[in-house]
Design a protein with these regions (language model features):
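Eukaryotic intrinsically disordered, low-complexity regulatory linkers and tails enriched in Ser/Thr/Pro
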Residues: 1-103
Length: 103
């Protein structure tokens, strides 16, 4: 399987990639290659977008949908993030946080 970055026209063979992670700055997807090198592959506007792009790549790898995965653009990720349901906030003990209003 290959991953492709439209903006830079970079293509990487996943057989040459040891790991994929959010870069140091927090707004990029970086690749750790089997040769020991690290390459910044794609830059995004936020860490949340970078994490979502990695999640999309992981889903594609898991399902084995295609031979080439094109890294999503920021606009596509923003739409996907906005459509996600809000997470329910729970206290560290696992209980819901108590609301202090209403009747």
């Amino acid at each position: 399987m290959f991953i492709y970055n439209r903006k830079t026209n970079k293509i990487f063979n996943l057989n040459a990639v040891a790991n994929i992670f959010v870069g140091r700055e927090g707004d990029s997807v970086s690749l750790g290659l089997t040769s020991g090198q690290i390459s910044k592959f794609k830059e995004y506007n936020s860490e949340q977008e970078a994490r979502e792009a990695i999640a999309m790549l992981a889903d594609t790898i898991r399902v084995g949908k295609s031979e080439i995965f094109t890294m999503p653009e920021s606009e596509e990720l923003k739409q996907r993030i906005q459509q996600m349901p809000l997470e329910q906030i729970h206290h560290i003990s696992g209980k819901k946080t108590k609301g202090h209003g209403g009747s």
